[in-house]
């Protein structure tokens, strides 16, 4: 047992002993995530992705979930400060190709994010699908952080969207993070996904490896699980790009986020390549400017 994990065990015992149920649960979650890190050390340290990540997915009935576990080369304080803000989440979510707009606001039920999802190319905001995410900060302690986004309805009969982030500090410079992206679908969503997988998504694959071919090359997850892994990976890369850009002067951070996110996706062309860099950069600059103008 590591020293930090041992300290966490002592803290959970103290919290539970004095009846602090919420702290008890939070400490329990922290221990669970640290245990997951220990279990995944081999995969995190030795993989084909050129970074310390582990990606998996599940499908249960009409529900899909993609999971990314990653070691972030940033202090825990930077990660938690960035991910506890709904406004920062909009700066993160706007980076993937098909996000057209994001606006953080406060409603009767708390903070929410109005996100427009559409084509991977330039598109008017009003033509993109609206997802209304409720934002909830679950935990923020020196040993554990968790926040969640949830949307009841999505485009084309999809539903129950969830983006969840949890993190624990590994040392003064590194953080272990778990990102999960999940949604459910009905008949309309199933048909739309089948059309996508038979056309523009036919050659796409995911990131988890299901075996090796006759030449010893990895066989990657395909189908709907491959698709949900790609989306989860895009969001992870967006978080990493946002955290990296904090090293730059404020006026340069937007362009650095855009450049960093695209360059990262190009490391995985079979999974994530959608357009050339000049087209992506121009599109995102326009979308962010449009987003900033609309929020004024």
Model-predicted regions and their roles:
Residues 2-16:
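Bacterial N-terminal signal peptides that target proteins for export
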Residues 98-162, 184, 242, 265, ...:
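Glycine-rich portal/gate segments that line the openings of hydrophobic small-molecule binding cavities
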Residues 22-26:
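N-terminal signal peptide c-region/cleavage motif recognized by signal peptidases
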Residues 55-82, 104, 220-227:
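Terminal, regulation- and interaction-focused segments at domain boundaries
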Residues 72-98:
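Amphipathic alpha-helical segments
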Residues 73, 106-109, 135-144, 166-176, ...:
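A short, structured loop/turn motif at beta-sheet edges
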Residues 51, 64-68, 78, 111, ...:
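Envelope-exposed proteins and targeting segments
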Residues 28-49, 53-54, 69, 152-154, ...:
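Terminal "cap-and-tail" regions of soluble proteins that handle hydrophobic small molecules
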């Amino acid at each position: 047992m590591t020293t930090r994990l041992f300290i966490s065990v002592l803290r959970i015992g103290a919290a539970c002993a004095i009846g602090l149920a919420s702290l008890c649960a939070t400490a329990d979650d922290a221990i669970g995530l640290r245990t997951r890190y220990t279990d995944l050390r081999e995969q995190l340290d030795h993989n084909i992705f050129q970074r310390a990540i582990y990606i998996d997915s599940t499908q249960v009935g009409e529900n899909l979930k993609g999971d990314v576990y990653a070691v972030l080369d940033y202090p825990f304080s930077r990660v938690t400060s960035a991910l506890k803000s709904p406004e920062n989440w909009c700066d993160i979510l706007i980076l993937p190709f098909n996000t057209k707009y994001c606006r953080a606001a406060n409603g009767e039920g708390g903070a929410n994010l109005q996100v427009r999802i559409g084509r991977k190319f330039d598109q008017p905001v009003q033509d993109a699908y609206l997802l209304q995410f409720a934002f909830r900060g679950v935990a923020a302690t020196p040993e554990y952080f968790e926040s969640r986004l949830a949307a009841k309805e999505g485009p084309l009969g999809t539903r129950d969207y969830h983006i969840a982030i949890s993190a624990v500090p590994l040392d003064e410079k590194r953080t272990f993070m778990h990102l999960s992206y999940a949604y459910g679908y009905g008949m309309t969503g199933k048909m739309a996904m089948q059309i996508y997988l038979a056309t523009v998504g036919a050659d796409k694959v995911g990131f988890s490896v299901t075996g090796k071919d006759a030449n010893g090359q990895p066989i990657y997850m395909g189908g709907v699980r491959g698709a949900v892994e790609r989306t989860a990976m895009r969001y992870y890369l967006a978080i990493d790009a946002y955290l990296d850009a904090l090293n730059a002067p404020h006026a340069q951070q937007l362009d650095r986020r855009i450049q960093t996110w695209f360059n990262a996706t190009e490391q995985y062309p079979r999974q994530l390549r959608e357009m050339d860099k000049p087209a992506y950069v121009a599109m995102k600059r326009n979308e962010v400017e449009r987003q900033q103008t609309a929020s004024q």
